[in-house]
Curated annotation (Swiss-Prot):
One biological process term in Gene Ontology: glutamate biosynthetic process
CDD domains cross-referenced by the UniProt entry: CAP_ED, STAS_SulP_like_sulfate_transporter
Family stated for the protein in its record: Belongs to the glutaminase family.
Top EC category: hydrolase
Domain (STAS): residue spans on this chain: 345-457
Gene source species: Bradyrhizobium diazoefficiens (strain JCM 10833 / BCRC 13528 / IAM 13628 / NBRC 14792 / USDA 110)
Encoding gene per record: glsA1
Lineage: Bacteria, Pseudomonadati, Pseudomonadota, Alphaproteobacteria, Hyphomicrobiales
PANTHER family per the UniProt record, alphabetical: GLUTAMINASE (PTHR12544:SF29)
NCBIfam families, A to Z: Gln_ase
Reaction(s) catalysed by this chain's protein: L-glutamine + H2O = L-glutamate + NH4(+)
EC number(s) recorded for this UniProt protein: 3.5.1.2
Full protein name: Glutaminase 1
List of residues binding a nucleoside 3',5'-cyclic phosphate: 480-595
SMART domains to which the protein is assigned, alphabetical: cNMP
GO molecular function: glutaminase activity
Length: 613
């Protein structure tokens, strides 16, 4: 079989982009429907236009077809203006004027509910009322507030199509009738003309399918624009907006839409459809021909295909909470990388179940945290529980609240909680600390190994051990030199020089010649790879740079954790010593093999934990 050329790799398309291409090609043949002409300027749209865009929550945007062709946002502005009103005015004010129930009527129905309020903010009556509330608050600045909000959702500055605005204003008598109905029932202020002028302008804002996809993804991302990273609206406003979109976003087709497609969506008579699947993606499409409900014919087909092909119906979700735990073990199965002395090892071996480590992955949701808390209670009570979160991608507020309640229970049982793998500047940390800030039994370390090392130290202290970093360990006590005679040790000592290092000093550098090995005399050092991964923490009595016996260049960096001293043995002198003392040489290499084997056993144990949980 002839392999494909190298250029084929660079020309290959991601699966989602290929899917959108397929939709574009297949549905371009769909010619049913008609361009909206009750607003004359909209009737000038080219019915052949067809563009699709999909934005992911990590900020990537796929585009096919006429995705950059501008068109007016029309009713797709409604969810964003509703969210703006909730944040600007508060839910109480907005909900006192606008309902949230489906109407079952066309979008431009001149009818109110039994309380003489609009049924919901997705029909024209509700949208005009929403704009009116903002006008009452901001006056002449109302439209600019709305335009800026829409621009923040899109991630770029949006303008108005003045021709469409003028056309809407000239033919907007039905909306004027709705406006005066709202005024009669005290839903909006006396200045109906000014409110409608703002409404006509907001509907005439120019967007593209790409803009709509990014705006939809911002809704799906709890109000955070995935392209710009800006928190555009509060999570509260977004969740309420998505709720109304789900029940009423597609007007009198809303029930059929949620039954068949199951993604919160909003359409506009300009030919656009936006669909926002929470925590997943945002979709924007543009095709001017509409069906009898005022929805883009091709746009609906794209949404149907996406939902069906990838099984995206929001009520058909699977989330097995058991998948939240990637590893669950104690320090007997996977201790820290600190090389311990015999006394410390004995204490830790006797109390290995006192430190429990649970490594988590994915989303800390309510169901995931509940499962973890029950799993934790299924084994004997430890003194320390370490939750490693570096694989956690998000934390829900419900999950964070349940975390806090679980931590409170652990505090009552005198269990110390240690968090690792989450930076204090991160969104996940802020979500967790919102609920756990008052708890006194919670500590945090960024590195899991540092967290385990700290917990091990506490166990050593609690059970009568000591860790004296200032204690000196002479050559005779070095494990790598175990078994050497007094004469051999004396001769080896003669070739060594005692080096002193300040805290933070870099002792060895990756890639440098391996021309010496070191025996740590006092203090502590840590060994890391160039990417920052910590391989080991060493205390007095441990060797480092010993791989010089096997390698010609350094394969890791070594830093002093505190003031430290070490015996430095130049490699050429050490090799001469080994040649002159073959028995000692054989003993040293046997000790080295044992040290390497011990490290391999620890590494294999961790691999076994991660693959068997």
């Amino acid at each position: 079989m002839t392999p494909p050329p190298a250029s084929a790799w660079t020309r290959s398309k991601p699966p989602l982009l290929r899917f959108l291409d397929t939709c574009l090609n297949e549905f371009s043949a769909e010619t049913s429907g008609a361009v909206a002409d009750y607003i004359p300027e909209l009737g000038n749209a080219d019915p052949a236009y067809f563009g699709i865009s999909l934005a992911t929550l990590d900020g990537h945007v796929y585009e096919v077809g006429d995705s950059r062709v501008p068109f007016t946002i029309q009713s797709m502005s409604k969810p964003f203006v509703f969210a703006l009103a909730l944040d600007l005015l508060g839910a109480g004010r907005v909900e006192s004027a606008i309902g949230v129930e489906p109407s079952g009527d066309p979008f431009n129905s001149i009818r109110l509910n039994s309380d003489n309020h609009p049924f919901n903010p997705m029909v024209n009556a509700g949208a005009i009322a929403c704009t009116g509330l903002i006008y009452d608050s901001k006056g002449a600045e109302a439209f600019e507030q709305i335009r800026l909000a829409l621009s923040r959702f899109a991630g770029r500055d949006l303008a108005v199509d003045e021709a469409v605005y003028s056309s809407e204003s000239q033919t907007g008598d039905r909306n004027r009738a709705i406006g005066y109905l709202l005024k009669t029932n005290a839903v909006i202020s006396d200045n109906v003309a000014a409110v409608l002028d703002v409404y006509f302008r907001q509907c005439a804002v120019l967007v593209t399918a790409r803009d709509i996809a990014v705006m939809a993804a911002t809704l799906a991302n709890r109000g955070i624009n995935p392209v710009t990273g800006e928190q555009v609206m509060s999570a509260y406003a977004i969740s309420r907006t998505l709720s109304v979109m789900t029940s009423s976003g597609m007007y009198d087709y809303a029930g059929e839409w949620i039954y068949r497609i199951g993604i919160p969506a909003k359409s506009g008579v300009g030919g656009g459809i936006l669909a926002a699947l929470p925590a997943r993606l945002g979709l924007g499409s543009y095709s001017p021909k509409l069906d009898k409900h005022g929805n883009s014919v091709r746009g609906i087909k794209v949404c149907e295909a996406l939902s069906s092909h990838y099984d995206l119906h929001m009520l058909n979700r699977s989330d097995d909470a058991r998948n939240a735990v990637i590893a669950d073990y104690d320090i007997g199965k996977s201790p820290s990388r600190r090389v311990r002395r015999a006394q410390e090892r004995e204490i830790l071996a006797a109390h290995e179940q006192e430190v429990r480590i649970i490594e988590l992955v994915g989303t800390l949701s309510l169901s995931a945290v509940d499962y973890v808390s029950r799993r934790l209670a299924g084994r004997p009570r430890p003194q320390f529980v370490i939750f490693d979160l570096h694989r956690v991608t998000s934390t829900t507020r419900a999950g964070a609240r349940l975390v806090a309640e679980a931590f409170e229970e652990l505090a009552a049982l005198n269990v110390t909680v240690v968090l690792s793998g989450v930076r204090r500047a991160s969104k996940e940390w802020n979500t967790l600390r919102e609920w756990t800030a008052e708890l006194k039994n919670v500590r945090d370390f960024y590195l899991l190994d540092t967290a385990i090392e700290w917990a091990e130290d506490q166990i050593v202290y609690r059970y009568g051990g000591s860790i004296d970093f200032h204690e000196t360990t002479e050559l005779a006590e070095q494990p790598l030199l175990e078994g050497l005679s007094a004469d051999e040790l004396a001769e080896l000592g003669a070739i060594c020089t005692i080096r002193t290092y300040q805290s933070g000093a870099k002792i060895l550098t990756t890639g440098d010649p391996a021309d010496a090995l070191f025996f740590l005399r006092s203090g502590a050092v840590h060994v890391t790879l160039p990417d920052g991964v910590r391989l080991a923490t060493l205390t007095a009595g441990m060797a480092f740079g010993e791989m010089a016996l096997l390698e010609q260049t350094r394969s890791a960096d070594v830093f002093a954790d505190m003031a430290a001293t070490a015996f430095e043995a130049p490699l050429k002198d050490f090799e001469r010593f080994r040649e002159q003392h073959p028995r000692a040489s054989e003993r040293i290499m046997r000790n080295l093999a044992q040290l390497l084997a011990d490290r391999l056993i620890v590494a294999n144990a961790k691999v076994d934990i991660l693959t068997s949980t």
